[in-house]
């Protein structure tokens, strides 16, 4: 059928189908570019100074940057498949209010910035750029409790509340031990002590020796003797159990009750050495009770000279053995060996070494300025009846103690002369101004120069200076220098 040119144009213009031309794609591209230029031209209408004064809103009317806008922007692309199925099953003729609002592809902020919202189609400028766009959406739908572990937001009470199971508590203890920090281990043990039964705690610590030692030390420090005894009883540590039981005497103030308690400790399973100490402790307290009662009576009566001149400053009860010996040497030195308060009786009963006895007796008698007793303390007789002075502690220490108690020079010179080492003797004599000892020693050494140097240290015109001059002018001494 022949058609005119006008009929063909009318046909193609009236038909729903359009003929293909190569210019169509260029027309669409030109339209897209034109739209972009129109969008970008909006920036010219907004001054940079006024941009902060404008309130940016989304297509839904929500202010851009608000909390509700952020939630809707984030939740727009995270709708679940379950919600989509519900939307399909709903009546298509339902009202618009019942349908969820579709996520907006653009917002005013994205238009002004020239880019699309993350998750939507890219603009031409974004498509041509080499850098891919990234979006980070917070998980706003998750409750805070689910990501507390990641944000390190657990409070101490929440942490403790989580550790309700015994295995979690034991794991906590093992982690503390692995850190090798005593403070952390002790803190965990305090928590376990409060939250676990004794049987479970003891059983778990029995195989964890490091934690066990920390608990034992902690219980000793706080004085929890009851729990400590239960622990030793569970571990079958009989000797440590006995020692812990013995420590309870420190809490008993009454002397008679403490003595009776110590008596019950004698039969406990101690080592041989510890058993001897427990027996001595009981015997000493028994002696102290007797001595205290007798001396209190003598002091109140006022008939004993030593108690009148030197009143007691404290009770002898519960004092150490050395203090008790000093007390006896001070107030009861001359008593017979058969009495409980006699120093010799104490020495034999408790097997006090000679050095300790001499030191204590010397300090006590020197304090009383009883120089005759001091002299008798160091005087011994041999089997021929000859006397000799002997000091198990060394005479140099005797001189130091005597000088500390303000002994006169005559007494000091006697014991300085008994020092065997010449250099030590000269040093002590010079230090304590025992002039005769220095002069005689220099004469025996035939040391003229040292004697001449010492002459400047004595008082002019004194008897010591005259003695030195007489020795220096003597022709009978052959000086070595």
From Swiss-Prot:
Annotated Basic and acidic residues bias: 141-151
UniProt KW Oxidoreductase keyword: no
UniProt-annotated stretches for the region Disordered: 122-155
Positions of modified residues (Phosphoserine): 120, 123, 129
One GO cellular component, as annotated: recycling endosome
InterPro entries hit by this protein: Spe-39 (IPR040057), Vps16_C (IPR006925), Vps16_C_sf (IPR038132)
Subcellular location: Cytoplasm; Cytoplasmic vesicle; Early endosome; Recycling endosome
Record Pfam families: Vps16_C
Gene3D superfamilies xrefs: Vps16, C-terminal region (1.10.150.780)
Residues bearing the modification Phosphothreonine: 21, 116, 131
Alphabetical UniProt keywords: Cytoplasm, Cytoplasmic vesicle, Differentiation, Endosome, Phosphoprotein, Protein transport, Spermatogenesis, Transcription, Transcription regulation, Transport
GO annotation terms (biological process): cell differentiation; endosome to lysosome transport; intracellular protein transport; spermatogenesis; vacuolar transport
Major localization listed first in the record, in broad terms: cytoplasm
Purpose of the protein: Proposed to be involved in endosomal maturation implicating in part VPS33B. In epithelial cells, the VPS33B:VIPAS39 complex may play a role in the apical RAB11A-dependent recycling pathway and in the maintenance of the apical-basolateral polarity. May play a role in lysosomal trafficking, probably via association with the core HOPS complex in a discrete population of endosomes; the functions seems to be independent of VPS33B. May play a role in vesicular trafficking during spermatogenesis. May be involved in direct or indirect transcriptional regulation of E-cadherin.
Complex formation: Interacts with VPS33B. Associates with the homotypic fusion and vacuole protein sorting (HOPS) complex; impaired by VPS33B. Interacts with RAB11A.
Family: Belongs to the VIPAS39 family.
Name assigned to this protein: Spermatogenesis-defective protein 39 homolog
Organism from which the protein derives: Bos taurus
């Amino acid at each position: 059928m022949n058609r005119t040119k006008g009929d063909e144009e009318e046909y193609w213009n009236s038909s729903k189908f359009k003929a293909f031309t190569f210019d169509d794609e260029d027309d669409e591209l030109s339209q897209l570019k034109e739209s972009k230029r129109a969008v970008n031209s909006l920036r010219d209408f907004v001054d940079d100074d006024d941009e902060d004064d404008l309130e940016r809103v989304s297509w839904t009317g929500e202010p851009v940057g608000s909390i509700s806008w952020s939630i809707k922007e984030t939740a727009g692309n995270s709708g679940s498949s379950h919600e989509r199925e519900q939307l399909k099953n709903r009546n298509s003729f339902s009202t618009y209010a019942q349908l969820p609002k579709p996520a907006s592809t653009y917002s005013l902020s994205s238009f002004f910035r020239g880019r699309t919202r993350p998750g939507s189609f890219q603009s031409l400028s974004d498509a041509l750029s080499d850098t891919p766009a990234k979006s980070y959406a917070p998980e706003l739908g998750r409750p805070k409790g689910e990501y507390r572990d990641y944000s390190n937001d657990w409070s101490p009470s929440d942490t403790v509340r989580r550790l309700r199971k015994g295995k979690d508590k034991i794991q906590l203890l093992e982690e503390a031990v692995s850190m090798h920090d005593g403070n952390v281990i002790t803190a965990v043990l305090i928590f376990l002590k409060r939250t676990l039964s004794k049987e479970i705690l003891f059983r778990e610590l029995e195989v964890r020796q490091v934690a066990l030692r920390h608990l034992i030390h902690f219980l000793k420090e706080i004085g929890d003797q009851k729990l400590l005894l239960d622990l030793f009883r569970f571990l079958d540590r009989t000797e440590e159990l006995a020692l812990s039981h013995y420590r309870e005497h420190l809490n008993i103030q009454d002397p008679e009750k403490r003595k009776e308690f110590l008596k019950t400790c004698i039969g406990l399973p101690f080592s041989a050495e510890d058993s001897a100490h427990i027996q001595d402790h009981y015997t000493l307290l028994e002696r102290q009770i007797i001595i205290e009662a007798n001396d209190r009576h003598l002091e109140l009566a006022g008939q004993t000279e030593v108690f009148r001149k030197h009143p007691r400053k404290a009770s002898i009860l519960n004092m150490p053995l050395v203090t008790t010996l000093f007390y006896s040497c001070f107030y009861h030195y001359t008593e017979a060996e058969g009495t409980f308060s006699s120093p010799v009786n104490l020495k034999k009963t408790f097997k006090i070494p000679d050095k300790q006895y001499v030191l204590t007796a010397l300090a006590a008698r020197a304090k009383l300025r009883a120089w005759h007793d001091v002299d008798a303390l160091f005087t011994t007789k041999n089997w021929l009846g000859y006397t000799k002075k002997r000091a198990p502690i060394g005479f140099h220490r005797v001189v130091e103690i005597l000088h500390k108690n303000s002994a006169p020079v005559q007494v000091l010179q006697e014991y300085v002369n008994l020092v065997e080492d010449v250099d030590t003797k000269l040093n002590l004599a010079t230090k304590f101004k025992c002039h005769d000892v220095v002069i005689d020693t220099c004469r025996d050494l035939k040391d003229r120069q040292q004697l001449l140097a010492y002459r400047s240290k004595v008082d002019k015109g004194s008897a010591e200076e005259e003695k030195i001059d007489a020795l220096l002018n003597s022709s009978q001494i052959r000086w070595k220098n």
